[in-house]
Structure formats: C-alpha cells, structure tokens
From Swiss-Prot:
Pfam family, one: Ribosomal_L19
Domain of life (superkingdom): Bacteria
InterPro entries in the record: Ribosomal_bL19, Ribosomal_bL19_CS, Ribosomal_bL19_sf, Translation_prot_SH3-like_sf
UniProt organism field: Rhizobium johnstonii (strain DSM 114642 / LMG 32736 / 3841)
Protein name per its UniProtKB record: Large ribosomal subunit protein bL19
Cellular component aspect of the GO annotation: cytosolic large ribosomal subunit
Keyword Ribonucleoprotein (UniProt): yes
Biological role: This protein is located at the 30S-50S ribosomal subunit interface and may play a role in the structure and function of the aminoacyl-tRNA binding site.
Family, similarity comment: Belongs to the bacterial ribosomal protein bL19 family.
One GO MF term attached to the UniProt entry: structural constituent of ribosome
Gene: rplS
GO biological process: translation
Family matches, as PANTHER family: LARGE RIBOSOMAL SUBUNIT PROTEIN BL19M, RIBOSOMAL PROTEIN L19
NCBIfam families: rplS_bact
Length: 179
C-alpha cells in the first residue's frame, strides 16, 4: 500500500468513526440527509430517490441518486465521504441486474419502477440496519436524559445557593434590627 492509499484509508476511517453509512447498492431507494447552508443558517434537507450508480473507489467514491420532482427527472451525485452528508437511510431494497441504471433516464411511469428485493440478503441487511438505528436512537435518548438530569441537578444547586444567599441576607437584615 503506497502512502496516498494509506492516507486515504486513514481519512476514510476517521470519517466513518463519526458516521456510518448503511450498505446499499444501485436499485435501492435511499434518503440522503444533506446539510444545506442558506446565508448564515444551516439546515438538513432530505433527498430521496433511487440510487442509479456507484462509482469511484476509496475516498473518491460517490453515488448518484435520481428522483422525479414535479414531473422532471433530477439526478444528484453525492461523494460518500462528504462532510455535507449527515446520514443515508435505505428506504427499500431494489432487485436489479445491472451496476449502472442509466436506462431509467429514458423511462417514465410503470416501466421505470424497480422490483423490491425481498430475498434473504435484503431482509438480513434491513434487520441489521433497523437494529443499528434503534441502538443509535437509544444512545441519543440516553444522552438526552443524562443531559436533562445534569441540567436539573445544576439548576437545583443554583436554586439552593440562591435560597441560602437569600436566607443569609434576611438574617443579616434581621441582626441590625435586633440590636
């Protein structure tokens, strides 16, 4: 392995540590959550369509997603390791016999449909993804609960300190009156 491949592998591992992408192939319907910056505000926009191609390799790997928007075909190419991609969800598995589905560009309506894959591989991948998503949601929920508890404890400590300060101030105000 030469130096460039080694550096690319390290970068890919670093990006995969932050977010993991599910296993998907051409023919699968995917929902890509993309970060969109409008002025100073950044939001996440979902782009859902059929993956018609995967190309490249290593850090330069990308995939093409096609959808029909208002009767017009729209294709978008996403680099797999782009920081603008927040997540990719597989909506359904497609059963195709080609690696590149460019023939869908010429088709409309029912002829452009892709049969859903209900085989063992698809079920296994879907079950694994559902388990991973459920685990991720549970982890996020646990973090939220821990943060809420820490915030409540911090607020209670601040309220107790405030009450103590008020009691000391009242005691100090009562002392000169007693003299």
């Amino acid at each position: 392995m030469n130096i460039i491949q080694q550096l690319e592998a390290e970068q890919a591992a670093k990006i995969e540590a932050k977010r993991t992408l599910p296993e998907f192939s051409p023919g699968d319907t995917v929902r890509v959550n993309v970060k969109v910056t409008e002025g100073t505000r950044t939001r996440v926009q979902a782009y859902e369509g059929v993956c018609i191609a995967r190309s490249g390799g290593g850090l330069q790997e990308n995939f093409t997603v096609r959808k029909i928007s208002y009767g017009e075909g729209v294709e978008r190419v996403f680099p797999i390791y782009s920081p603008m991609i927040e997540s990719v969800d597989v909506v359904r598995r497609g059963k195709v016999r080609r690696a590149k589905l460019y023939y869908l560009r010429d088709r409309r309506g029912k002829s452009a449909r892709i049969v859903e894959d209900t085989g063992v591989r698809a079920r296994k991948l879907n079950d694994a993804e559902r388990a991973a998503i459920a685990e991720e949601k549970a982890r996020i929920e646990a973090e939220k609960v821990a943060a809420a508890q820490a915030l409540a404890a911090e607020k209670a400590a601040a309220d107790a300190a405030e009450a103590k300060a008020a009691a000391e101030a009242a005691a100090a105000a009562a002392e000169p009156a007693a003299e």
